[in-house]
Amino acid sequence: MLSTLQLTERFEDSREIKNIMGKYVTSCLLCREDTIVDSLFCSRDDISLGFNHGYYVGRQAVKEYYEAVCAATAKKSKCLQKIFPEQLGKLSDEELYGVGPFKAEPLTSFYMQEAEDGETAKAIWMVEGSITDITEKGPVTNWSWGYYCADFVREDGHMKLWHVLRVEDVHCPNGVDWGMPENNFPELPEFSELKDIKLPEPTVKETVYETYSASRGPAKPPRGPEPYKTFAETFSYGV
């Protein structure tokens, strides 16, 4: 049976974990993904970031992914400045950065388990998000419903991110049948320079979670945290 002190410490750990993920999605909302590794992840080299299509494994790979996202954001904002010179033409690069993309990822249904040894924790959230991107087809807003899963490790007395997994159950343009998620909007010449934007390929390419389609059968959510003593006795949200 846990003592009052241990229960208090676990309450503090739970609050810290919620705050970390709140900062994570806020960093994405503010297009500051390039700050995430240094501010929210642990200092270990074996961190990872997973999506439906695979994992970025290792500190360098994760940082390069986030930096590529920010570079793409800067290019999209510059493109909009050319298209709307009256509204955006006088903005500096710093003021302009982040104009266009909008990533709203509200977190809900929080559930976590902390290891009996107190050194690690696991948590899962549902996400009912709406993400606006600037593409070669212009601004496109997609529903992005799914899950955030994460492993945390204690470092210098505080919980830090170790492995993050963000999988989408639904990804489709707003106003489109979920069973027909294809983006069939025409390309627009004024946005053509955005066609060559590509993010780094995952370190490990695999289908981690299949997005909903008319041909997909019923899919279980990602495995939720279960009581465990040490991390060696449980599963990982990373690779």
Task: Tell what function each PLM region has.
Residues 1-35, 39-43:
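Short, low-complexity N-terminal intrinsically disordered segments enriched in polar/charged residues
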Residues 28, 41, 127-129, 165-168:
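Short beta-strand segments enriched in hydrophobic/aromatic residues
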Residues 34-129:
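A solvent-exposed, acidic/Ser-Thr-rich amphipathic alpha-helical stretch
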Residues 89, 126-136, 227, 231-238:
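Extracellular/periplasmic carbohydrate-active domains that bind, remodel
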Residues 105-107, 142-149:
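Short, surface-exposed coil-to-beta transition loops
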Residues 120-124, 145-182:
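Short beta-strand edge/turn micro-motifs at domain boundaries
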Residues 130-142, 171-174:
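Short, cysteine-centered beta-strand-loop-beta hairpins and adjacent loop/turn segments enriched
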Residues 179-239:
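A hydrophobic membrane-anchoring alpha-helix module
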